């Protein structure tokens, strides 16, 4: 999508217009991964139950998915529910699952309209049958969409993914001497996808929370104090602009450092 296409979606004179004009569409991250954090604090600041923070977070998901698709991001991965989240109160978990079902039903048309392919990464088979049915229906309906790939990490843990990948590698019969990093990556949930170029975490916390541990080896990390329910198009654009100001080295040295040698 071109800059003009994205600008046509933004009302004339809106502050986001200036941000879009600064974006270099030749240096966009292929894959953006986001840790959606801060729902509970958002609710607490407003003296509301935690579940209201999760409800408000749905609007942030909707805005972020559409913005990323219009930016022509190839892959967007959102961390929705971790393996560790099962430790939370049963009422909160049931609300999260209800909101997930509601989102899929209400937003499926938007996903199809924007040519977005929906996928789940994580131990989906451990979720309730009705949740699995909703997820599979959304994946089936969008399977042929050729636009942005939208991953939701559900019942997900980075260490669990690596363990699951190791098991699949063993089950495949691959010989130990034939297993290298490239081959091992084909057994991950994200096989065939580019690794995240940009990892965004909301709420100001400085940790990766067991998220995409293998894949974020060389990702640029951007942390914003913004709580997830308040995260909007502007915040995603700001993260992309910050990413574009960085020099990715992949363990090497910068051009300036090389010349100094």
Please place each PLM-identified region on the residue numbering:
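Flexible, compositionally biased loop and terminal segments
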Residues: 1-261
């Amino acid at each position: 999508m071109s800059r003009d296409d994205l600008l046509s979606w933004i009302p004339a004179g809106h502050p986001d217009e200036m941000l879009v004009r600064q974006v270099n569409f030749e240096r966009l991250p292929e894959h953006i991964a986001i840790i959606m954090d801060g729902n509970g604090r958002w609710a607490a600041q407003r003296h509301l139950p935690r579940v209201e923070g999760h409800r408000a977070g749905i609007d942030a998901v909707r805005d972020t998915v559409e913005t990323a698709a219009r930016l022509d991001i190839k892959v967007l991965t959102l961390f929705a529910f971790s393996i560790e989240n099962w430790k939370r109160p049963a009422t909160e978990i049931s609300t999260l699952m209800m909101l997930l079902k509601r989102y899929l039903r209400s937003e499926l048309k938007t996903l199809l309209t924007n040519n977005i392919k929906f996928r789940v990464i994580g131990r989906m088979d451990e979720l309730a049958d009705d949740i699995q049915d909703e997820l599979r229906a959304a994946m089936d309906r969008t399977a042929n969409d050729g636009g942005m790939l939208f991953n939701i990490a559900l019942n997900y843990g980075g260490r669990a993914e690596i363990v699951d990948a190791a098991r699949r590698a063993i089950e495949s019969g691959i010989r130990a001497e034939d297993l290298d990093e490239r081959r091992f990556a084909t057994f991950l949930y994200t096989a065939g996808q580019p690794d995240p170029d940009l990892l965004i975490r909301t709420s100001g916390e400085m940790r990766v929370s067991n998220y995409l541990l293998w894949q974020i080896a060389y990702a640029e990390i951007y942390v914003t104090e913004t709580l997830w329910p308040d995260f909007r198009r502007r915040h995603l654009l700001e993260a992309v602009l910050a990413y574009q100001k960085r020099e990715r080295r992949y363990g090497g040295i910068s051009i300036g450092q090389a010349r100094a040698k």
